[in-house]
Design a protein with these regions (language model features):
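Bilobed "Venus flytrap"/periplasmic-binding protein-like clamshell domains
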Residues: 26-56, 111-177, 290, 294-299
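Pocket-lining segment of extracytoplasmic ligand-binding domains
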Residues: 81-83, 91-93, 121, 158-248
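An extracytoplasmic/periplasmic, membrane-proximal ligand-sensing/linker region
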Residues: 166, 170, 176-177, 187-205, ...
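Ligand-binding clefts/hinges and TM-proximal coupling segments of bilobed small-molecule sensing domains
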Residues: 132-149, 220-295
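Extracytoplasmic small-molecule ligand-binding "clamshell" domains
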Residues: 39-70, 75-80, 236-237
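Bacterial N-terminal signal peptides that target proteins for export
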Residues: 1-10
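Acidic, polar ligand-binding/catalytic clefts
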Residues: 71-110, 120, 188-193
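C-terminal motif of bacterial Sec signal peptides marking the signal peptidase cleavage site
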Residues: 19-22
Length: 315
């Protein structure tokens, strides 16, 4: 009998030890990013360098990340605020595919709409894109939807433009080779792909007039007026008015609360390390938590509460 009790005690101890070891190692966090050359991808990799439990998943961007989050293929993802708004409301491209399991963690930085053309192009405004060959980003990316909205803002139907879907890197190469006339980028400025392109050729960024900015910010949720400062890229010698969206980190409501809390804390406590790889990384708590389309994950809300900030938590 004593032998049986001793064996049971050893078995229980072994199970507890294994459980403790498993907890200390942590669980894998599948983080949806974006395509190479974009800040989502760089940001996600900066986070994975700080936490070995993070596995970066390269995706087509915001729309893909929302669908992957809904279907359980990723635990967290980076998405544009406007795409997040449509997804949780079940509108736009998510009309028949509403996402109800997304919870906010933090807004990471502002993304600016940047329409790039050659410096000697006859294209001066978004309205001049009619009949031109234009890359509007990858399919199922947020930028493709943004492009359609911008066309609408200047009374253009997407059928009036010869659009194609390419990554930012391939778009830059195509502009350099003269096979397209313009391409859309929705990234924080500066971004690597445009910085490199501006070294290889003379470029311009199309400005948005006040009417277009008003149309975009009033009609669509999650859009803000923003400015690309002179000197951001080589050859950009004047401020360029445009619109932007917030890049928001979201988590599935099923993602462990302690994991999300620790992740949220890392965003701010390790901001200096993140900035070494992503200059735009935000450390402003007000920016991170205000005007977010969905409620916050319990774990994120717990962190904000611990530093005296109240956010809207959603079950």
């Amino acid at each position: 009998m004593r032998k049986i009790i001793r064996l049971l005690s050893l078995l229980i101890a072994s199970v507890l030890f294994a459980a403790l070891c498993s907890c200390s190692k942590g669980s894998e966090i599948r983080l949806g990013s974006g395509n190479k050359g974009g800040i989502y991808y760089n940001y996600a990799n900066a986070l994975s360098d700080l936490d070995g439990n993070i596995t970066v998943k390269q995706t087509a961007g915001s729309q893909a990340n929302m669908r992957l989050l809904k279907d359980g293929f990723i635990d967290m993802g980076i998405v544009q605020s406007d795409v997040l708004s449509e997804a949780i409301k079940g509108t736009g491209d998510f009309k028949d595919n509403k996402v109800d399991n997304a919870r906010a963690v933090a807004a990471l930085y502002m993304e600016s709409f940047q329409i790039i053309v050659a410096a000697d192009s006859d294209i001066e405004t978004p309205a001049d894109l009619k009949g031109k060959k234009v890359s509007i980003g990858e399919e199922h990316s947020g930028v493709s939807k943004n492009a359609e909205y911008i066309f609408n803002s200047v009374s253009l139907d997407i059928d009036m433009i010869d659009t194609c879907n390419m990554t930012y890197e391939k778009s830059a190469e195509a502009l350099k080779n003269g096979t397209i006339d313009a391409f859309f980028v929705v990234l924080g400025a500066p971004c690597d792909v445009i910085t490199q392109l501006s070294q290889d050729m003379d470029i311009r960024i199309l400005p948005f007039d006040d009417r277009t900015i008003s149309y975009m910010t009033n009609l669509y949720d999650g859009y803000y007026e923003t400015v690309i400062k002179a000197g951001t890229y080589k050859g950009i010698d004047e401020d360029v008015k445009t619109v932007g969206v917030k890049a928001v980190l979201v988590a599935s409501k099923k993602t462990d609360s302690n994991t999300v809390r620790n992740f949220t804390e890392m965003l701010f406590e390790e901001n200096g390390e993140i900035k070494k790889k992503v200059e735009l990384a935000n450390n402003d708590l007000k920016f991170a938590t205000e005007n977010i389309p969905c409620g916050f994950h319990k774990g994120a809300a717990n962190y904000y509460s611990s530093i005296g900030m109240a956010v809207k938590e959603e079950d």
